[in-house]
């Protein structure tokens, strides 16, 4: 009997889904604790309480697990992005919500930014291409559509999509570095308040740069 003809019982299917999620959750927790993606299969197994062989069973390798983790935690953000594009609101407001959404996603999953960059700059070209397809290209396309809409309506000055992407994402990426800077320069500061202020500042700054008079 082929694997495609095997029907799992609801209980068995739930067990498999639960094990897969436990492995992903364990990897995420370890990356946050270590502030590094240098985690071993043995450590993931110990954290999850499962056998390390299950990593290969579900994901093929540790890299496969990390890509799956990226995909899982970015899925919600990408769905929200599609919903944003369909909204009947001003392009400037769409861009505000988009940029705030990126930094909110980083805040919700603090390992996501670190993992994304590690995968994009890693030695495995197929992995780099897959991560680019899953995460980078959708964000680039979203920004391109919002920019085109804003320029067509006269809300935005003409800007290069690629340059905008690099500058806007760079500012959003820096959001993940604020904790270390703040701890060194402002002992006892309210980290959550600082992050809220940073998000608002970046959104205001980037959207203001798109105004028709900004480039004059």
What is each PLM-predicted segment?
Residues 19-28, 44, 69-73, 77, ...:
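Generic hydrophobic, amphipathic alpha-helix propensity
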Residues 33-37, 88, 109, 153:
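Short coil/turn segments at alpha/beta junctions that flank glycine-rich nucleotide-binding fingerprints
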Residues 68, 82-114, 162-168, 196-199, ...:
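Hydrophobic alpha-helical connector segments
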Residues 117-148:
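A contiguous binding-surface segment within folded domains or other stable secondary-structure elements
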Residues 1-8, 104, 108, 137-153, ...:
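C-terminal peripheral helix-coil segments that are non-catalytic and often amphipathic
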Residues 22, 30-64, 68:
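Helix-turn-helix
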Residues 108-129, 178-185:
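Amphipathic alpha-helical segments used for helix-helix packing
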Residues 20-21, 41, 63, 67, ...:
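Short, structured helix-loop boundary elements
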């Amino acid at each position: 009997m082929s694997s495609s003809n095997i029907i799992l019982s609801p209980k068995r299917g739930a067990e498999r889904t639960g094990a897969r999620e436990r492995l992903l959750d364990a990897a995420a927790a370890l990356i946050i604790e270590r502030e590094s993606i240098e985690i071993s299969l043995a450590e993931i197994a110990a954290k999850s309480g499962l056998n390390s062989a299950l990593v290969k069973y579900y994901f093929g390798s540790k890299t496969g697990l990390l890509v799956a983790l990226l995909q899982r935690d970015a899925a919600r953000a990408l769905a929200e992005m599609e919903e944003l594009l369909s909204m009947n609101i001003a392009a400037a407001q769409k861009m505000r919500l988009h940029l705030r959404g990126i930094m909110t996603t980083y805040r919700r999953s603090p390992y996501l930014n670190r993992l994304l960059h590690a995968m994009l700059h890693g030695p495995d070209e197929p992995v780099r291409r897959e991560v680019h397809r899953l995460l980078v290209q959708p964000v680039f396309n979203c920004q391109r559509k919002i920019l085109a809409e804003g320029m067509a309506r006269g809300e935005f000055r003409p800007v290069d999509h690629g340059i905008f992407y690099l500058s806007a994402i760079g500012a959003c990426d820096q959001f993940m570095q604020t904790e270390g800077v703040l701890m060194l320069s402002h002992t006892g500061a309210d980290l959550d308040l600082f992050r809220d202020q940073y998000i608002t500042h970046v959104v205001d700054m980037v959207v203001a740069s798109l105004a028709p008079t900004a480039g004059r």
